[in-house]
Amino acid sequence: MTASDFQHQTVLLREAVDLLRPADGRVIIDGTLGGGGHSEALLASGATVVGVDRDPVALAAATARLGANPRFQGRAGNFAELPRVAADLLPVDGVLVDLGVSSPQLDVAERGFSFSKDGPLDMRMGPDGPTAAELIATTDERELVRILKDYGEEPFARPIARELKKALPTRTLEAAEVVKRAVPRKAWPNRIHVATRTFQALRMAVNGELEALDALLAAIPGLLKVGGRAAVIAFHSLEDRKVKEAFRALAGRCTCPPGLPVCVCSGVGDFALVTKKAVAASEAEVEANPRSRSAHLRVVEKLR
């Protein structure tokens, strides 16, 4: 896949941009540049935008499209590494991270993310690290069970892991067939493909997605100016739960010095929840882009 092939439908575009309040002089980091849709809208509102992405194809495509704007610059990196990747800019006025897999990554068979087309069982968002096939081959069965349970919430993790270790699939459709064999037909879910949770778990393990999210959430206080906002778009319960809990902790955390015998700050944190509940895609957006159905946007603001 080349940069010219990278076309992506941006999720919760208006909602995310409006809540980040871009304006002249404000600096916002788009930690998951992808197709550049969010960054383009932020630029249109006058902000200076630094787009970060670990996928070199996505970075090249978005930079080719947006690079003529002097208020844009693209940088290679993982959003977990923003304190390093954007060290010269910090603190900033806003940070946006969209945790979804982009449409080109899902739709291009060679990337190996989807069982809808046959391709190598890869699943890497960047060029480095082991592929999903290599992960299956080198991970013992017990650890594979943990991955399927923790990252995919897969109820049939044990039989699936056992069959994956027997078959050692190297192609996407081959892996999907292994899952089909491992799960009793009467237990197949109605609304999703029987291999969906397994593919999600493998992808998250290959790319260290939950670990990257943990690193981002821990870094937020140091990334933002007072008045700055962080916006995170999550697509499944594991991620959204982490974001929700982290933002609530920031907003309600006691800020008293450690030596005080009692709390005198009333538990008021250094942050405020901008979104009391997660913002979901509108019916119109879901109709136009079904992948937005599971998107949840949460925003927090630094108070001091």
From Swiss-Prot:
E.C. number(s) listed in UniProt: 2.1.1.199
Residue spans crossing the bilayer: none
Catalytic activity: cytidine(1402) in 16S rRNA + S-adenosyl-L-methionine = N(4)-methylcytidine(1402) in 16S rRNA + S-adenosyl-L-homocysteine + H(+)
SUPFAM superfamilies (UniProt xref): Putative methyltransferase TM0872, insert domain (SSF81799), S-adenosyl-L-methionine-dependent methyltransferases (SSF53335)
Keyword Cell division appears in the UniProt entry: no
Enzyme class per UniProt: transferase
Highest taxon of the lineage: Bacteria
One of the record's GO molecular function terms: rRNA (cytosine-N4-)-methyltransferase activity
A single GO BP: rRNA base methylation
Positions of S-adenosyl-L-methionine binding: 36-38, 53, 79, 98, 105
Gene3D superfamilies: Putative methyltransferase TM0872, insert domain (1.10.150.170), Vaccinia Virus protein VP39 (3.40.50.150)
NCBIfam families the record matches: 16S rRNA (cytosine(1402)-N(4))-methyltransferase RsmH
Family as reported in the entry's similarity comment: Belongs to the methyltransferase superfamily. RsmH family.
Name of this chain's protein: Ribosomal RNA small subunit methyltransferase H
Organism of derivation: Myxococcus xanthus (strain DK1622)
